[in-house]
Amino acid sequence: MTNIWHTAPVSALSGEITICGDKSMSHRALLLAALAEGQTEIRGFLPCADCLATAQALRALWVDIQREKEIVTIRGVGFLGLQPPKAPLNMQNSGTSMRLLAGILAAQRFESVLCGDESLEKRPMQRIITPLVQMGAKIVSHSNFTAPLHISGRPLTGIDYALPLPSAQLKSCLILAGLLADGTTRLHTCGISRDHTERMLPLFGGALETQKEQIIVTGGQKLHGCVLEIVGDLSAAAFFMVAALIAPRAEVVIRNVGINPTRSAIITLLQKMGGRIELHHQRFWGAEPVADIVVYHSKLRGITVAPEWIANAIDELPIFFIAAACAEGTTFVGNLSELRVKESDRLAAMAQNLQTLGVACDVGADFIHIYGRSDRQFLPARVNSFGDHRIAMSLAVAGVRAAGELLIDDGAVAAVSMPQFRDFAAAIGMNVGEKDAKNCHD
């Protein structure tokens, strides 16, 4: 640990930000562009640690990628044009990079190894290994189906497969593998998960058929390079939405935010709590809906979150818990087993931090009760990001309603998904600074 973030409460928030490009879309654009023939230009690319891990892996597979700030140019190599890497491909902290790239590498004609940091190598990979092996892949994993993944590429055959959970990473892995396989791949989905891959593929000239709870992919297609504009990241915007809702005298505008209906549960849930959130200038960028979001300080109330909302809001739950702590009454969220196998055990980590901040909560194996108060002032305290970017940023938002300074261990881990977080925070009046850990004491 080399740094600590520190926050101070605010008397008001106001301002306007244009949020960074969407992380999920940036990953997918890189991968599809690499598989396409010809040149692709990606505008609004998110240069966060996770997406840069995907880019670096593709470079190691001999894909030409040039980046100038938020514009990335890629010369695609086609479905089987990737070349053997000289070393294991390090996905750092990015589960999306590992799971999606595994679907591509399984069909290549060479061997490769996917590894990551300590956190990533604890995350479950059986969900992708099982169907890829059914397609003909040869994958050797570490104990308990975790990374490193040793992949011996070989020709794949399409399968008929029922997804065991609503996971966009699993679904996208198999769509990519299906494109490279012989025959047809039929995926039977269970519940809603983000559909950026399905929306983006036709922009590259690819085709798939989407029916209710079924996706059909035919192998042997060709993709072609294109010019692609990445929408603003709703998961990133959610931090500033909650900051505006809980800060006094707040009015914040967030421009160009993607409002894909498979991602927008966080907006609905905050509105159900009484949050005043308005969507202005709704339009489309390519296949993705976009809006400018205006958020006002609001008196929130506790709610019970129905299970069907969880997959849609899984990445936003840490910041949602901060909103719940500032809502009057009890908020209940269940069906949270997936939250325990993210970059950290986010359920346990957020519960521990909430309690440190003076918030009463009860936690079970897959649920949490949060006992909120509309007059909440979080206790001044030192809290722990657990090396998790979304927890670090959620705790920074809590700082706007604290009774004094919050110290956040390893706040800089936010760069995994939003290196611009502190710049955006400053633009609307939040106080988030950084100091060296050796100068901080409990």
Curated annotation (Swiss-Prot):
Catalytic activity: 3-phosphoshikimate + phosphoenolpyruvate = 5-O-(1-carboxyvinyl)-3-phosphoshikimate + phosphate
Binding site for phosphoenolpyruvate: 23, 95, 123, 169, 346, 390
Active site (catalytic residues): 315 (proton acceptor)
Binding site for 3-phosphoshikimate: 23-24, 28, 167, 169, 315, 342
A biological-process GO annotation: amino acid biosynthetic process
One GO cellular component, as annotated: cytoplasm
Pathway(s) the chain acts in: Metabolic intermediate biosynthesis; chorismate biosynthesis; chorismate from D-erythrose 4-phosphate and phosphoenolpyruvate: step 6/7
Gene Ontology terms for molecular function: 3-phosphoshikimate 1-carboxyvinyltransferase activity
Gene3D superfamilies (UniProt xref): Enolpyruvate transferase domain
Domain of life: Bacteria
InterPro entries: Enolpyruvate_Tfrase_dom (IPR001986), Enolpyruvate_Tfrase_sf (IPR036968), EPSP_synthase (IPR006264), EPSP_synthase_CS (IPR023193), RNA3'P_cycl/enolpyr_Trfase_a/b (IPR013792)
Catalytic class of the enzyme: transferase
Subcellular location: Cytoplasm
Keywords of this entry: Amino-acid biosynthesis, Aromatic amino acid biosynthesis, Cytoplasm, Transferase
EC number: 2.5.1.19
Role description: Catalyzes the transfer of the enolpyruvyl moiety of phosphoenolpyruvate (PEP) to the 5-hydroxyl of shikimate-3-phosphate (S3P) to produce enolpyruvyl shikimate-3-phosphate and inorganic phosphate.
Subunit structure: Monomer.
HAMAP family given in the database record: EPSP_synth
Family: Belongs to the EPSP synthase family.
UniProt protein name: 3-phosphoshikimate 1-carboxyvinyltransferase
